[in-house]
Amino acid sequence: MKKVNVVAIGGGTGLSSLLRGLKIEVGRSIGRLSAIVTVADSGGSTGRLRKIYNIPAPGDIRNCIVALSDAEELMQKLFQYRFKGDGLEGHAFGNLFLTALTDITGSFLKAIKETSKILKTKGDIIPSTYENVNLVAEFDDGKVIKGEEEITEYGKKGHKVVNIWLEPKNPKAPEEAIERIKEADLIIIGPGSLFTSILPNFLVPQIREAVKESRALKVFVVNVMTQPGETDNFTAWDHIDTFLKFSGIDLVDVAVVNTQMPSNGLLKKYLEQNQEPVTPDVGRIGREGITVYAENLIGESGDFVRHDPQKLTEVILKILENELLSKV
């Protein structure tokens, strides 16, 4: 099998799950793996550090570095460690580490590269912008809300997003991100929070235009569960349709959709939190000319239902073989 260049775009736990599976294929079917990650997060440890040090959000970057890490498990646990007690309470060690390295090197991009070396990542992590941006959304009642967490919370009141942008407007993307998109054979979008993890990347004009112009196969991985305040009652097609509407991207070639229901116990817990499995309306997606891969993709861990990294990777490999390599 020819080795291909893969670019994954997103943020949050969804992107981390995808990367955790894909890293095993680096050096096998994947020649180069690059993650382009949102830095618009404004909550928790990340939000506090952004306000104090005026840096892009380190949280999703940290999660992706750990997901791609080939370092000892202890190092991975260290970077995910959260402090308790007064002063540092809630801060992740990795966030503090990236913040300190940004100050030492004078560059957020350099800090990511040096941290990636220390954790021996099997791929490159690149922020979608190196600017300190904030996500802003206008809702159907005319209200304008700033900040990822705040947008999701306002959405829980039943309001729908009608417009979304970054401030400052037109932030610049790292040149490396544009180059990786241009050289990609496969671009994977998602999984992740639609409005607050995936779309912010495409609100960076250079990222959006590079993806639009790319001849790579574009794959959209649909979330397995709806998210309160963002995708309430969304079907699989609703996720794709909303992405296309707000991202400015013309099309996706392939959609990956989960067909498996969670176990009864976990399903009950999710329903109590106003979350439900995303309906796999495969026929509706197919009518748009999008090839659909619909399979059992979930993994259950504790109280969470997420994409299983191995199952998701197996589907991506199938897509590579059927949609890309067989047509070369």
Swiss-Prot record:
Organism: Aquifex aeolicus (strain VF5)
Origin superkingdom: Bacteria
Classification via SUPFAM superfamilies: CofD-like
Keyword Cytoplasm in record: yes
Subcellular location per the Swiss-Prot or TrEMBL entry: Cytoplasm
Name used for this protein in its record: Putative gluconeogenesis factor
Keyword Cytoplasm annotated: yes
UniProt-listed PANTHER family: GLUCONEOGENESIS FACTOR-RELATED, UNCHARACTERIZED PROTEIN YVCK-RELATED
UniProt-listed GO biological process terms: regulation of cell shape
UniProt family annotation: Belongs to the gluconeogenesis factor family.
Chief location category: cytoplasm
Biological function: Required for morphogenesis under gluconeogenic growth conditions.
GO cellular component, one term: cytoplasm
Keywords linked to the UniProt accession: Cytoplasm
Gene Ontology MF annotations: LPPG:FO 2-phospho-L-lactate transferase activity
